Amino acid sequence: MELVKIETVDDVKKFSAEIKKYIFENKMFMDIHGKGYIFVDGWSLVGGMLGVTPIVRELENISDETTIRYRSTVELIKDGQTVGMGIAICTNKEKGKTAFDEYAVASMAQTRAIGKAYRIYIGWIMKMAGFQTTPAEEMDSVDTTVSPEKLKKIVEAYQDGNDTSDGTE
């Protein structure tokens, strides 16, 4: 695979339009109140296209008697050099995670750290593509209820390439 080269603002505009289309068509984002939050697979796709690979450097069990808790540290590597880093925690006390097994809590800590590392490194590209810069996996506690009418407007706006930050025209 040939890596994407970004040297000018026009390169970024073209690349962000391409990734917006791909991420939308492949449902690699979550809509929260009319704003698109990209899942870590979308962040990884864009990072990979730029030659950036996440490496989990540490996964630390910081649990206590009542809480399963993991902290993960991830580095982004490009051409053998560290170009970014993300640190994240997940616990089984979070909304929606009380039934998670230990491995799932550990896995989510890694997923969040990967998303955070990419957000720091390429969040500006995702913003140009019309998405929010917070990875979707960090938005677990947000109420994602959207009315059917508003969801239809959001989908139409994304399809037309005329999306706004709040999903309105």
Language-model-derived ranges and their functions:
Residues M1-T164:
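Polyanion-binding surfaces on beta-sheet-dominated domains and ring/shell assemblies
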